[in-house]
Amino acid sequence: MNIREWPAEERPREKLLQRGAGSLTDTELLAVFLGSGVRGRNVVELSRGLLVKFGSLRRLLEADREAFVGELGLGPVRYSQLQALLEIGRRHLATSIERESAMDSPAAVRRYLKAMLRHEASEVFGCLFLDTKHRPLAFEILFRGTIDRASVYPREVVRRALVHNAAALILCHNHPSGISEPSQDDVHLTLSLKRGLALIDVRVLDHIIIGDGEPLSMVEHGWIVA
């Protein structure tokens, strides 16, 4: 059935306008984004099929370009639109952290860092720079690729800390494998960075690792001491 023949309250776009985006299912949200279906499948049927194919909305959103554009009903235009939409969301989240108030809990920090890194298909390393009251100054991704002592340069982390006049920082990186437990390289890298930053009186408060589940705090698990 053509979606235009549905009752108005059941059409995804009208439902969103009447009840808000939070009332929509993943299928309906994707249908609103796609806008139209393909021959023989309305947009809701297309959306449902895509979610089945990719396994979840998250996996669809995190799919690489080749996998995304190869699906019927998708393509480079929709891929670029989706990437722009995701980046808008990330930037909105970043700017929503008010500099005037410190992050109110370690859990809030972990949620923020997970939102900033979980979409990355490859390994990345970043820093959340903080002032003397542990209020956020800036978040930056500094390195991409395999994260180990050979690819993360302490002098660059020190330089960025000086640029932001940071008094403390929180290190973070993701594990695309989904496993959050730190490797020996992760531990050694963290200790090396702590020593380097101590020379300019900048404290490393934690190193957060982002995987599929809850973000892991190396301090809370005893791998390092703040």
From Swiss-Prot:
The keyword Zinc applies. Zn(2+) binds at residues 173, 175, 186. A motif (JAMM motif) lies at residues 173-186. The keyword Zinc applies. InterPro entries: MPN, RadC_JAB, RuvA_2-like, UPF0758, UPF0758_CS, UPF0758_N. Residues 102-224 form the MPN domain. PROSITE patterns: MPN, UPF0758. GO terms for molecular function: metal ion binding; metallopeptidase activity. Pfam families: RadC, UPF0758_N. One of its GO terms (biological process) is proteolysis. Keywords: Hydrolase, Metal-binding, Metalloprotease, Protease, Zinc. Belongs to the UPF0758 family. This is UPF0758 protein Pput_5194. It comes from Pseudomonas putida (strain ATCC 700007 / DSM 6899 / JCM 31910 / BCRC 17059 / LMG 24140 / F1).
